[in-house]
């Protein structure tokens, strides 16, 4: 189980958030408010046909996220 970023996860993957980059601060704050925090479990539900955006599930919340935003989230695929 190699560490990677959320942008590299595939549909169906279940991931554990290990770290979120310090910058950009605004994005980090928004992710924290949505429940994307270290230790959270994320499931990749869908990826758009051109690869961007991706739909993820964090707890009971469904989110749509751009790949550029997903690159600041370090994960471990379970």
Per-range role (PLM):
Residues 2, 26-30:
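Short alpha-helix capping/helix-loop boundary micro-motifs
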Residues 6, 31-35:
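Short, surface-exposed secondary-structure edge patches
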Residues 12-13, 48-78:
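C-terminal structural segments of small proteins and small subunits
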Residues 14-27:
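Short, structured beta-strand/loop micro-motifs enriched in basic residues and often containing a Trp
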Residues 20, 34, 45-47:
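Residue-level recognition of beta-strand microenvironments
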Residues 38-44:
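Conserved beta-strand/loop element in small beta-rich adapter and peptidoglycan-binding domains
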């Amino acid at each position: 189980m190699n560490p990677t970023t959320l942008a590299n996860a595939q549909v169906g993957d279940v991931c554990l958030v290990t770290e979120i980059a310090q910058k950009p601060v605004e994005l980090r704050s928004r992710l924290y408010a949505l429940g994307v925090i270290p230790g959270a479990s994320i499931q990749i539900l869908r990826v758009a046909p051109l690869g961007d955006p991706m739909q993820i599930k964090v707890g009971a919340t469904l989110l749509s996220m751009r790949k550029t935003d997903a690159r600041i989230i370090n994960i471990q695929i379970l």
